[in-house]
Amino acid sequence: MERQLNMQQQEVTHEFFMPLLIPSVTHQEKQVHVVKGKPMFYEPAELKAARTKYMDNLAQHLPDKKFNGKVRLMIKWLFPIKGKHVNGEYKDTKPDLDNSVKLLQDCMTKLGFWKDDRFVVSLITEKFWSDVPGIYINIEEVE
């Protein structure tokens, strides 16, 4: 169920799960070259590939209508289990959440999940080890 309307509170939510191996590259990894004394920023190939992967997966889950008001964005990053870790255990290794969120949120904004990313007034994000790797996303209108 990707979209539901709570008739009591008139809150709109949109939730989905993208089964995928989460790229290890983050938005923080943009590169800079100085050309004629001016810094020129660019995305290395690995970052472009990660952006494309997110865009392709997110495009399959676009809401029927873009969110135009304040939203709470919840993201759960589920990484494949390595070593002695168990399903559902918090992951305390790289990548850093803040850098991972930036790339994903930029892709969601570009695809039109919401009118502007300034409307994301609440952000809840966690990362876990999981038997099923991927990204769970829940977007909820708030007042």
Feature names for model-found ranges:
Residues 1-143:
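Acidic, proline/glycine-enriched N-terminal capping motif
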